[in-house]
Amino acid sequence: MSHHPDPPATPPASPPVTIPMLQAWRAEGRRIVMVTAYDAAMARLVDPVVDVILVGDSVGNVCLGFDNTLPVSLAMMNHHVEAVARARPRALLVADMPFLTFHLDLPDTIRNAGGFLQRGAAAVKLEGGAARVPVVEALVACEIPVMGHLGLTPQSVNAMGGFKVQGRAVAQARRIVEDAKRLEDAGCFSLVLEGIPAELAARITEALAIPTIGIGAGPHCAGQVLVLHDLLGLLPGRKAKFVRTYVDGYGLLQAGLAAYAEDVRAGRFPGPEESYALPEAVRAALD
């Protein structure tokens, strides 16, 4: 473990990002940048360059070893939201509502979502279409901002038969468009569009006043989101078609770890510069 704690987060130099700011940027045509983060260190890394930080339930398959997001619990999400919030990010902090935390009844849903705001989030994100309208309306009525999520919704992986592009059939495309309009009318301040054809996402973006955030939805959305580990190349193996990897983070980290192991085994680490000297008076007393 480190011999000293992380330094406290420095106060942001620019004002915090707010929901009205995102909506104004959408009207101005300024693209919104959103990434995931799951702890304070990640939040400090991304905060200077992004507009929105999503504490996604993707933490389940990215960090916790699950095959999908379904096993992620409310307690797990609370833990990670608290960790990110401790970094005091300037970016808008959005917390994912995990599976079965907004499906059963409205009082529990409001309590679960409100708990995220009490832990430092500014908004929540939830998956689903028209069936979620009563949930969105109830949350918005309680002053809990909601970001919707349509298209390839990972919590529906079993119903969809896998992680498959949505909206390629006429009826499905029409339903996604209609769901987007209904979620906007219900009070969502933004929508994530995942895994749908680029032209369909463009049509939805044009039809809505609120910003759309794309992931695997082409270049015409009001903003884009990627999992941080994907864009930094921190996960080995096959990537989704929509992922662009900007650096071989996995390779760089492996090289650093290999150099550390080599230095330890060769007796080169730690050296004098990483060691503490014994005061002369103490040495004399011990002799």
From Swiss-Prot:
Its EC number is 2.1.2.11. Mg(2+) binds at D57, D96, E127. GO terms for molecular function: 3-methyl-2-oxobutanoate hydroxymethyltransferase activity; magnesium ion binding. The keyword Metal-binding applies. Homodecamer; pentamer of dimers. HAMAP family: PanB (MF_00156). This is 3-methyl-2-oxobutanoate hydroxymethyltransferase. The lineage of its organism: Bacteria, Pseudomonadati, Pseudomonadota, Alphaproteobacteria, Hyphomicrobiales. The gene is panB.
